[in-house]
C-alpha cells in the first residue's frame, strides 16, 4: 500500500501546526471532541431536509477510551462519518475544513452552529501521538476506510471493517521524555479534567468508562473497583437556559463549580443578546476580595466560550480594570478566533461585547445601591477602592461612568453616603463639596481644619484611603459643585465683611508674620492669620494643587521625587498663644524663634508628618517648661 504525501505545503507546515499554533498540549482533546460534535451536527442538519432521515439525539454520543497497556487513546463518535474521498480531502489536505465547507452548503441555524472552521484542529493530535489512525464509515455507505499517518512524511488510506456509522480516532501516545510526560493523557482523572475544562458544554454526551467503588456482592464492608460508563460533560450550559427557570441556588452552584471563589456571589447578571453580536454571559460580583486581588499574580478576565467550547480561561479584554473583580463567562458564536482557537483576533465583535458587559455591570451596581444598600456597602468595602482607581486612571476617562457608584463617610450621617446624597442636602448658600483627609475617621474628627466648615453646619466627607483625594482631584466636581479640601487656602465661606477684616489683620500683623516666615525659612511658603480655626492655636494649610495628604502618599512611594506641598502655617488670632507671639516679637526674638518652631512642629504632628529634628523639638519643649 503506497504512502501518499500531504497535498498542502509540506513538512514545514505540519511542523508549524504541531509546534507553533497550540500553546498547550491538552488542547488536542478539545479539538478532537469538537470535530466529533461537528460530525453529529451534520447528521442533524441533513435530517432537517431529508425526510428519510430521523435525528434522535439520545442515539448520538462521543466516547473517550484509554488503554494504558496498548498506550492508545481513542475518541469515537456516532456522527456522519467520512468516505474515502472525504478522508483524502479533509485529512490529506492541511487547513482544509470540512465543517466550514458544510456550513457554507447548509446555511441553516435553528439553534445549532458547527464549531470547526479552520481544518487544523485534527492535527493537534500529533502533539501527543506518534501515530494517528482514523477509522470511519460514512452515512449511507457500505464501506469503511482507515486513514493512518505518523506525521509529516505522509499517510495511507485503505478499506477496513466497521459495523456502525461514525468515526474512531486512535492515538498512539508518545513515550515520556525528559521535558514532557505523555502518560497523563492515558489517566482517567486527567482526561475527565480536560473534558470538564474545555468541552463540558458540548451538546452531546461525552462518555467514558469510569472506575468506581461498589460493595462486593453479598458483602456490606468489602468494596471492589468496577468500570462503569458515565457521561462526563454537563451538556446543557446554564447560560442557555431561560432566566425564569433558574434560581439563586442554581447560580451559586455554577459559581462554586467553576471555582470563581470560595465565597458566595453577592449578586449576578445573566445576559442574553441576539442582535448584531449574539452572545450569552453570566457575571458575578464576589462578596469578598480575593486574597491576591492587589498583587501581580491576580489575573482579571472572564472565561470565553465559542459555541460552548472553552477558548480562553481569562479573557482580559472583556473587562475594564475598574471592574476587574467581576467573575464569570461569555459564550458567543460570532467571535473571530485565530487559527488555533486559543486566542481572539482583536475585532469589533469583542469590543461590542466588552462595552455592553461594562454597562450591565454598572447598571447592576446602581440597582444594588438603590434597592439593597446593605449589600452594596458590603461590596463597596471590598471593591470601592478599585472604583476610585477607575476614576483616577486613564486621565479620568471613566470618571463619569463611575462617579455615581462612589461612597464616602459623612461627618453628619456617621456612615457612608453617595455624592448624590451629599449634594441633595447641601444648604443653598454652600458653594463647595467639602472633604478632609486622614488615617482614620476619629483622627479626621479632631483635625483643627474642620472647625470652621463644621461650625457653618456644612457636611464634610472623610477620605481615609490613599486613592481618595487623587480620584476626587480627577473628578474635580459633581453636579457642578467643586470639591474643596478643608485644608485648602480659601474655603469659599468668607463674606465680604470677613474678607475685609482678614485683610486688616494681615496688614496689622504683617511684620510678625514676616519674621516667623524668616525663622522657618523654606519650610513654609507663608505664615498668615487663620480663618478656619476656632479653638486650636495653629494648623497647616496648602496652597496649590498638591495637598499635604498627597505629599505624604507620593513620598511614601518607591522612587519618590520628594514632592512638597506649598505649606502655609496658619495662626489663630483669637487663641492665647497669639498674644504670646506678639509679646515675644516685641520683647524677645529668641523666644519668638523658639515658639515659632514649636508651633510649626506641632502643626506637623497634627498632620501626621515627621518632625525633621526630634531632638531639637524635645529640647525646645524643655526650654519652655523651665
UniProtKB/Swiss-Prot annotation:
Cytoplasm in keyword set: yes
UniProt main location, coarse: cytoplasm
Segments of this protein annotated with the region B: 342-552
SMART domains in UniProt: HATPase_c (SM00387)
Record region (A): 1-341
Localization, UniProt: Cytoplasm
InterPro entries per UniProt: HATPase_C_sf, Heat_shock_protein_90_CS, HSP90_C, Hsp90_fam, Hsp90_N, Ribosomal_Su5_D2-typ_SF
Record HAMAP family: HSP90
Family indicated by similarity: Belongs to the heat shock protein 90 family.
Listed name of the protein: Chaperone protein HtpG
Record organism: Bacillus subtilis (strain 168)
Organism taxonomic ancestry: Bacteria, Bacillati, Bacillota, Bacilli, Bacillales
